[in-house]
UniProtKB/Swiss-Prot annotation:
Belongs to the semaphorin family. Residues 767-805 are annotated as: Disordered. Residues 44-717 are extracellular. It is found in: Membrane. SUPFAM superfamilies: Plexin repeat, Sema domain. The keyword Transmembrane applies. It is a single-pass type I membrane protein. Residues 1-43 form the signal peptide. One of its GO terms (biological process) is positive regulation of cell migration. Pfam families: PSI, Sema. It comes from Homo sapiens. The keyword Coiled coil does not apply. This is Semaphorin-4B.
Length: 837
């Protein structure tokens, strides 16, 4: 399909003359697929959108002075301390106090030394942007120390942090313990990498060279260092995004080993297209892999990789660039139910928008692909094809299992050479790990994802938190095959991407990091929904209606609840579950039954009535005295949803209702009244001060009169002024035309003559082109070009021409007399055609 799409692009770019008369039908069908809008099943909009600094969704923010690039986040085991890695600094924040204004925190400065910065600048890197120490790895190594690595001005270094006093670890001489970070941390701060610690051993996926052309998946901090083989091209310019540890040995009947999975995007060599094709991958290695004895020494003997496929279900349009992956595992014992949530973008753009997609992969599908067939490449043609012949035993790339132990193979060091030689060229699996697309967002570029499994009142739901490239946070819930975006929050200023997300599931907090700082956002905000309808229509698994307010489900105690709590994530049946008083049809609501806001209008003015809606998915319904408002000259609903009133001919009680999924609720109610002579009553019967809504230019102060009569119309004056203006312009024009009518006739007659015999301008040579003897063309311009009026030459004038040297043939002359121009003109013979008579 991609090859066809590229052919279509070249077909569209070809000149019209080169196009075939009838293009192939497949190209036309593909063009229709590319131009059609995404189906509404996957393209969703957030129900609620809140701007930055909204009081309805408060959250806390941390930022230190002169510090930027907050990229690494780590939460302590007890959840009380948040460790943050930034540019040349690390922080230990209290989750309770540090995010408050003036809160205390611990800061640890760790910058690159001056010599490394000088070398970095000498190598052509930017001193301010590149030659700094960006913290890329921040992991717990033990119960007392943290392990961290930074770019250190393109000379990556690693060190240890004492968690007790938050200082760098030192040796007996007082020097900071530093280790070479090559192979653990990238040189370039813009390069993506991933790392995790398993049983005290560090597994990383990064690049190991200054140029960034030596990628590797390695294990360090161990007595058995192992890495991928660079000469075998196991990795093709990868961009690592995530890694995960899955304890597959628990409950395994085959005696399988634990595995570490790496997620990345790379160039797919198995595809042949006109441009390099990016492919999303999942790679795995065994925890007990020690390398080979003779073949693949200190190299992985269990490295296998496969393609992750995330595409549209309708037309197969691929989202092939992996941005982030979150591993959701219920428990170590239930690792078979592990889900991998991935955020993807596309290498190609469909239309004018650059969207993203969220796909979910199951552990069952991953294991099926890694247990399937292999691919191999033909060295001569560089073509990849499926291996169908038998493979050696034990199975290449598999961990040491009970079947291998029965063959006296208890370690990878004991694997036969034929198995390892086969693996060197057969590291790519033939199958593709297919996914289920949950969400397609054409208007947002998702970059980070975090998932929390929430127990609701009746079921368990997966809540997704998605960070965008422009500082927004989407909160969505997965309900079967569908996804509902609960809310959209602007947590950072526009242009700052969300660089990291971290969940504190025990305290119900979400931490998000960007270039400018770190924010602490509560996962739930049930107090935002003030009615039963809003609480249920939100589909928020954290919230339920308690009978009087929307509360967090963790507060639900069945034995203490006086009324049953209501929650319906699947159907959101607010019309059936909420109280009857909230769902009465607006057509039968008596006027004046609901509280009405008193507003005052001035006569002959244009006014608007606001109707703010909390939900982006709801529609408005305006009623006047219980009947729907129809568009007219004096009443019109604006595109914003506000009601525009022109004049005061139609007054009464105006109500604005919100309609969403069959549920109706009153949003606003207005009772406008006309203020005579611009004077407003100070108070109404209830003692409240009425609101004056007016758009007139002259308004009267309270208790006074306007300087202009509010009820006077200037329509007649306007017509009189327009008439006088037209007369003042037309009369002088007509007078000038009548006075100069004779001149106009002469001008028009000259134009007719010129149209019959147009004259050309004389060609006068410039001075520098004249002959050196001083002789030149006659001073009188020869503008007739062989035509001369018989009476043009004045008496006594004589011009010598060729007619005086040779006899003039009268037969070759031609005289014409025009009825428009009565003066005769003569055209001479061909010999003297250009002479002056």
């Amino acid at each position: 399909m991609l090859r066809t799409a590229m052919g279509l692009r070249s077909w569209l770019a070809a000149p019209w003359g080169a196009l075939p008369p009838r293009p192939p039908l497949l190209l036309l069908l593909l063009l229709l697929l590319l131009l059609q809008p995404p189906p509404p099943t996957w393209a969703l909009s957030p129900r609620i959108s809140l701007p930055l600094g909204s009081e309805e969704r408060p959250f806390l923010r941390f930022e230190a002075e002169h510090i930027s690039n907050y990229t690494a986040l780590l939460l302590s085991r007890d959840g009380r301390t948040l460790y943050v890695g930034a540019r040349e600094a690390l922080f230990a924040l209290s989750s309770n106090l540090s995010f408050l204004p003036g809160g205390e925190y611990q800061e640890l400065l760790w910058g690159a030394d001056a010599e490394k910065k000088q070398q970095c600048s000498f190598k052509g890197k930017d001193p301010q942007r590149d030659c700094q120490n960006y913290i890329k790895i921040l992991l717990p190594l033990s119960g007392s120390h943290l392990f961290t690595c930074g770019t250190a001005a393109f000379s990556p270094m690693c060190t240890y942090i004492n968690m007790e006093n938050f200082t760098l670890a030192r040796d007996e001489k007082g020097n900071v313990l530093l280790e070479d970070g090559k192979g653990r941390c990238p040189f370039d701060p813009n390069f993506k990498s991933t790392a995790l610690v398993v049983d005290g051993e560090l597994y990383t996926g990064t690049v190991s060279s200054f140029q960034g052309n030596d990628p590797a998946i390695s294990r360090s901090q161990s007595l058995r260092p192992t890495k991928t083989e660079s000469s075998l091209n196991w990795l093709q310019d990868p961009a690592f995004v995530a890694s995960a540890y899955i304890p597959e040995s628990l409950g395994s009947l085959q005696g399988d080993d634990d595995k570490i999975y790496f997620f990345f995007s790379e160039t797919g060599q198995e595809f042949e297209f006109f441009e390099n094709t990016i492919v999303s991958r999942i790679a795995r290695i065994c925890k007990g892999d020690e390398g080979g004895e003779r073949v693949l020494q200190q190299r992985w003997t269990s490295f296998l990789k496969a393609q992750l496929l995330c595409s549209r279900p309708d037309d197969g349009f691929p989202f092939n660039v992996l941005q982030d992956v979150f591993t959701l595992s219920p428990s170590p014992q239930d690792w078979r139910d592990t889900l991998f949530y991935g955020v993807f973008t596309s290498q190609w753009h469909r239309g004018t928008t650059e969207g993203s997609a969220v796909c979910v992969f199951t552990m069952k599908d991953v294991q099926r692909v890694f247990s399937g067939l292999y691919k191999e490449v033909n060295r001569e043609t560089q073509q990849w094809y499926t291996v169908t012949h038998p493979v050696p035993t034990p199975r290449p790339g598999a961990c040491i299992t009970n079947s291998a132990r029965e063959r006296k193979i208890n370690s990878s060091l004991q694997l036969p050479d034929r198995v390892l030689n086969f693996l060197k060229d057969h590291f790519l699996m033939d199958g593709q790990v297919r996914s289920r697309m949950l969400l397609l967002q054409p208007q947002a570029r998702y970059q980070r994802v975090a998932v929390h499994r929430v127990p609701g009142l009746h079921h368990t739901y997966d809540v997704l938190f998605l960070g965008t490239g422009d500082g927004r946070l989407h909160k969505a819930v997965s309900v079967g095959p569908r996804v509902h975006i609960i809310e959209e929050l602007q947590i950072f200023s526009s242009g700052q991407p969300v660089q990291n997300l971290l969940l504190d599931t025990h305290r119900g907090l979400l931490y998000a990091a960007s270039h400018s700082g770190v924010v602490q956002v509560p996962m739930a905000n049930c107090s935002l929904y003030r009615s039963c309808g809003d609480c249920l229509l939100a589909r928020d698994p954290y919230c339920a209606w308690s009978g009087s307010s929307c509360k967090h489900v963790s507060l639900y105690q069945p034995q203490l609840a006086t009324r049953p709590w209501i929650q319906d994530i699947e159907g959101a049946s607010a019309k059936d579950l909420c109280s009857a008083s909230s769902v009465v049809s607006p057509s039968f609501v008596p006027t004046g039954e609901k509280p009405c806001e008193q507003v005052q209008f001035q006569p002959n003015t244009v006014n608007t009535l606001a109707c703010p809606l909390l939900s982006n998915l709801a529609t408005r319904l305006w009623l006047r005295n219980g009947a729907p408002v129809n568009a007219s000259a004096s009443c019109h609903v604006l595109p914003t949803g506000d009601l525009l009133l022109v004049g005061t001919q139609q007054l009464g009680e105006f109500q604005c209702w919100s309609l969403e999924e069959g549920f109706q609720q009153l949003v606003a109610s207005y009772c406008p009244e006309v203020v005579e002579d611009g004077v407003a009553d100070q108070t109404d019967e209830g003692g409240s001060v009425p609101v004056i809504i007016s758009t007139s230019r002259v308004s009267a102060p309270a208790g006074g009169k306007a300087s202009w009569g509010a009820d006077r119309s200037y329509w007649k004056e306007f017509l009189v002024m327009c008439t006088l203006f037209v007369l003042a312009v037309l009369l002088p024009v007509l007078f000038l035309l009548y006075r100069h009518r004779n001149s106009m006739k002469v001008f028009l007659k000259q134009g007719e003559c010129a149209s019959v015999h147009p004259k050309t301008c004389p060609v006068v040579l410039p001075p520098e082109t004249r002959p050196l003897n001083g002789l030149g063309p006659p001073s009188t311009p020869l503008d007739h070009r062989g035509y001369q009026s018989l009476s043009d030459s004045p008496p006594g004038s004589r011009v010598f021409t060729e007619s005086e040297k040779r006899p003039l043939s009268i037969q070759d002359s031609f005289v014409e007399v025009s009825p428009v121009c009565p003066r005769p003109r003569v055209r001479l013979g061909s010999e003297i055609r250009d002479s002056v008579v």
